[in-house]
Amino acid sequence: SGHHDETTDEPSESSKPCCDQCSCTKSMPPKCRCSDIRLNSCHSACKSCACTYSIPAKCFCTDINDFCYEPCKSSRDDDWDN
């Protein structure tokens, strides 16, 4: 499970991994998890994505990283409701 095929086209800006609700433990290194809920898929860098069986499916990434991804909201419109 360590390799993934490079058959997809260049990822677009919108498929960059991002997370608005990220929480980390205070351990070293920190264990960070993104709790964003997305419809039908997880962000592009997610290795283990869990989805509900509803329609549309609500998906979240269960990966544990030692960092948080960039926030999704700020990348598009910085000045809107902060």
Curated annotation (Swiss-Prot):
The record marks 26-27 as: Reactive bond for trypsin. GO terms for molecular function: serine-type endopeptidase inhibitor activity. The keyword Lipid metabolism does not apply. Coiled coil: none annotated. InterPro entries: Bowman-Birk_prot_inh, Prot_inh_BBI. The keyword Mitochondrion does not apply. It comes from the Eukaryota. Disulfide bonds join 18-72, 19-34, 22-68, 24-32, 42-49, 46-61, 51-59. The record marks 53-54 as: Reactive bond for chymotrypsin. CDD domains: BBI. Keywords: Disulfide bond, Protease inhibitor, Serine protease inhibitor. GO terms for cellular component: extracellular region. Residues 1-24 are annotated as: Disordered. Trypsin and chymotrypsin are inhibited simultaneously. There are two separate reactive sites for trypsin and chymotrypsin but they do not inhibit simultaneously. Belongs to the Bowman-Birk serine protease inhibitor family. This is Bowman-Birk type proteinase inhibitor. It comes from Phaseolus angularis. The lineage of its organism: Eukaryota, Viridiplantae, Streptophyta, Embryophyta, Tracheophyta.
